[in-house]
Amino acid sequence: RDLRMSRGLGDVYKRQEVECGEGCDTAFWNTMLQKGTQTGCFASDDNHNPAKFFDALGGWVCVKSEELTHEAIVNHLLAGDYYASAGPEITAWGVDGDEVYLTCSPAARINFIAGGLVGGSETILQHESPLTHGLHTLHGGESWVRAEVVDHQGRRAWTNPIWL
């Protein structure tokens, strides 16, 4: 019930992950999305120094904006025009017809997570050459789709969902 009542934003990653393993919340986020809650995500440090492990500078958001002004950044954050990261860079993502596309820094895998359709998600793995882009074909019954990039060090980046 509490998850369904959340609105706006949720933290998908807190840097406390390095200290206690409780910083990644994609399962809760997916549950909220499956219930129809249109919420974005962010990654943060959640830094409480001093700690046993250095947990600063480990989570952030990258905003898609043509302008570097306070008003533009806030408007794009409110619109969900950003991705959250703990390492990988996502340079482009979106939907073109029935395909979801993503380009990124070299990755070990790209996960496309789709809502509303059993079996609608897909993982693309790096084999021989660096994995820097992925395409996922929509099947027609999805209500939303998002992507997750995992680099070779296990660090992740998450797009906000695109509602279909």
Regions found by a protein language model. Give the residues of each.
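Single conserved hydrophobic/aromatic residue that forms the stacking wall/gate
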Residues: 1-13
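Charged catalytic cores and adjacent phosphate/nucleic-acid-binding surfaces used
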Residues: 11-164
